[in-house]
Structure formats: C-alpha cells, structure tokens
C-alpha cells in the first residue's frame, strides 16, 4: 500500500509551519492564514551533476582552507542607472539573486525593462514575463521609446522550462516578472503560495550561482508594504530592494534592505516621466524645494542614507486641541520617537504641549529612522509653538537623550560639508560633532544640552 503524501500547515503571511491547523499564526499573529500544503521532495535535492559547485547542491563535498580560496572579485557590470548601481553596491554581481519589490504601479517592471533595453546593446539579456503578454510589454517599450532590437523576451511561468531556455540562451542578466506567478511541477500547491514561492526562489538562486547568471526577481508586497511570501525568500537571495513612492508624487525611492555586496539602506531617487523612470542625481535639491517665504515650524536636517548624506526638510504644526486627548501624528518619522521627544521637551525644556495637537511630516515622502533627526524635530515643534520661523540658511542635526543631553551622530563632518555645499551658512550640531576647521563662511553652534539649543534658537 502506497504511503500517503506528507502534509503540513503553513502560514501564507510569514511562512511559519505547524503540525496541525490552528486559527491564529503564533509567529505573525494573523488570523485564518494557515493552509494545508502537500510536501514533495524538491528536484533540486536529488543528485544532479549540472548543479554541482554550489552550497547545498549535489556532488562530492571537499574541505578547503580559507586561505586557499581565491579572492578574485567577480567583475560587476553597470545597470545603466547610477542610482540603481549605488543601491546595488556599485553594479550587478554575476551570479547574484536580486529581489525587487514595491506597490502596484510603483514602476518595478518599467525600471527593469529600461535596464534590460540598455544592457541588451552590450550583452545578452532575457526578460521573462508571467503577468503580461509579450504584446503588452512591447507596447510599453514602444511608448517609452526604448531600443528593443536586441532584447530577448519570453512568456512562461514554469521555472523548469525557463531555466532550460536560459541555459540555451546563456544570458548575462535575466529578469523574472514576477516570482508570485511562477510555479514548479513537483510542488503540489497553487502559484503564489508559500511553498511555491520558497521552492521557485531556491531553484532560481541555485541556477544563478551555478551558471553565473544574475537574476532579478520581481516580488509583490503586502498591505503594510513588506515583501509578500515566506521570510525564507529574503534569506536565500543576495540583495533585496524596495521601490516606493506616493501615488500623488512622481518621485520614487529605491532602497536596499539586504545586500551581500554593498551597504544596506542605500537610497536611490528616480522621477517618473513620460519616457519612464529618470534618475535624480541631486536628491537634496528636490527635498529642499522651499519657497522664498519663511514659515514657522520648518527645519532642515542632514540624514545619512547608506553611504551619502541627504538634506531633508521637517515640518511641524502645533495647534491648540479641541479634544480631551490631543492628536499626535507623524508621517515619515516614528510615532514612538515623537512621544519621547515631547516628554523630553516638557521635562528638560520647560515647554509642555499636553493641550496641543502635534503634526510632523518629512517633506518628499522620505522615511527617516535614524535618531539624528531628534534635534531638528524638536526645534521645528518649538518654532511652530512660538510661531517664530527658523532662518532659511540654518541646518540642524543631533540625537536627544532622555536626560536632555545632545548626543553626537556618525559622519558629522560629512553632514556639515553637504549642508555647506547647498548654501547653508549656520548649523546647530552636537558639541562632539563640531569640526576643528569649519567650512569657509559657515557658523557652527555646538550644543551639549537641550537648554543650550533653545538658547541658540532664541538668539538667532
């Protein structure tokens, strides 16, 4: 009598598996997301001489000394976009597996189609589409005015068939659009399920490593903006980037969340035009597009994104509340950080906003997570509360501690130099970040406590 196939219960949100069904996932706490899947042996586990030479593949394992391993770096090649290259750490590494995600309509397919059309003039590329027909892709390329003479296209959703064709074509870069519609014959579940996404991603990663083909996989995102599919998907790939942008804005930000070949949290900025995505070489000029009129509640700070400084504007609106519980709204900043800074301002600055509504926003849709924005945010709120504008040529950065001390931030010299390059002539920074030699024509105020920063603000 044949054995019944093994089954497991897997959460569709996070990929956690359980021996039996339950209503709520213990890992991500989502309800009614656990489904039954049939387990099947992956064909990649079986012995296959074609896949030897990559960790986890078949073949005879050989122990080597670390000193005997060649240190020759794989030569990168450019995508044709300097901002895209920056996010990837300097270009595409042959044999790497890259995952790019983003909301529907963000421009993932457009960016990759533009990239492949540029690279097709120099090397062999392959664009595999499973969501659109070849005619639809051709219409989009024609609308964008892209050179399509040398770009190879394939409409297929079977991973085994795609890899067979890719082995014949031998492209240097291949795009899979998207990983959620691909499937493997030996996995008994529908495309887009946790098991299918996990196995197809592992199959493509192994193919990339053993053939030296760089593969870019397009991934969907969930309602909260994170990459859809099991968490193991992000573990098996080399680089994970997210293309983000507001629906009412033409600017798009490309940020790396994982990168084995470069810096994490590197940021690239693009603008959506009629000819597709165009890179923005000077993002600070966009995020600082302020008018000539000076307004209260606005401050400029320097954030560190990956390997470069970026000037952004923080706006704050403090107004008397008509409700028993005043509102605290933060866009582009952490809500908990705002609550902490309001408490510090009350305790160590002598300013209480218990009866005030507080709204803060980072202009341009940039999300600031580092604590160097603390001092700029506090001064913006004080400026709005007192209805007194900060000078246009003033830049502020610094971390604020719970005791009211102003802590230094990394790369202080580079932040000050970036501000001076854009015409700022005054700066309020932590005392430990004051350079020995300030940029010519720039006045720097070093502060150690919150009270010192408020005193400087009063004297400006």
From Swiss-Prot:
E.C. numbers: 3.6.4.-
Gene Ontology terms for molecular function: ATP binding; ATP hydrolysis activity; ATP-dependent activity, acting on DNA; ATP-dependent DNA damage sensor activity; damaged DNA binding; single-stranded DNA binding; zinc ion binding
Lon-protease-like as annotated region, ranges: 357-460
Binding site for ATP: 102-109
Record keyword NADP present: no
GO terms for biological process, alphabetical: DNA repair; recombinational repair; response to radiation
Motif (RadA KNRFG motif): 258-262
Phenotype of the disrupted gene, per the record: Increased sensitivity to methyl methanesulfonate, mitomycin C, phleomycin. Has a modest defect in RecA-mediated conjugational DNA recombination; double radA-radD mutants have wild-type levels. 10- to 1000-fold decrease in survival after ionising irradiation (IR). Double radA-radD deletions have nearly 10(6)-fold lower survival against IR and the double mutant is more severely affected by UV radiation than either of the single mutants alone.
Pfam families reported for this sequence: AAA_25, ChlI, Zn_ribbon_LapB
Key words of the record: ATP-binding, DNA damage, DNA repair, DNA-binding, Hydrolase, Metal-binding, Nucleotide-binding, Stress response, Zinc, Zinc-finger
Mapped zinc finger ranges (C4-type): 11-28
Alphabetized InterPro entries for the sequence: AAA+_ATPase (IPR003593), DNA_repair_RadA (IPR004504), P-loop_NTPase (IPR027417), RecA_ATP-bd (IPR020588), Ribosomal_Su5_D2-typ_SF (IPR020568), Ribsml_uS5_D2-typ_fold_subgr (IPR014721), Rubredoxin_2 (IPR041166)
Entry superkingdom: Bacteria
SMART domains, per the entry: AAA
Cross-referenced PROSITE patterns: RECA_2
Family: Belongs to the RecA family. RadA subfamily.
Protein name as catalogued: DNA repair protein RadA
